[in-house]
Amino acid sequence: MDPCECSKTGNCTCGGSCTCKNCSCTSCKKSCCSCCPSGCSKCASGCVCKGKTCDTSCCQ
């Protein structure tokens, strides 16, 4: 099983090498979510994404 596979309904906690393109997890690390900008220090440690957008607690 691909450790970087992102399911649509579950959680994923991929490591720094994760290159998921279409992560739809409800809880996901920054490395799995393209919605989190690489230059954000708060996102660097991981943020919660909803589909392709970050929640209100990310990068505020």
UniProtKB/Swiss-Prot annotation:
Segments for region (Alpha): 29-60
Binding site for a divalent metal cation 7: C49, C54, C58, C59
UniProt entry keywords in alphabetical sequence: Metal-binding, Metal-thiolate cluster
GO MF: metal ion binding
Residues annotated as binding a divalent metal cation 1: C4, C6, C20, C23
Residue runs in coiled coils: none
Binding-site positions, a divalent metal cation 2: C6, C12, C14, C25
Family assignment from sequence similarity: Belongs to the metallothionein superfamily. Type 1 family.
Protein name: Metallothionein
Organism: Gobiomorphus cotidianus (New Zealand common bully)
Name of the gene encoding the protein in the UniProt record: mt
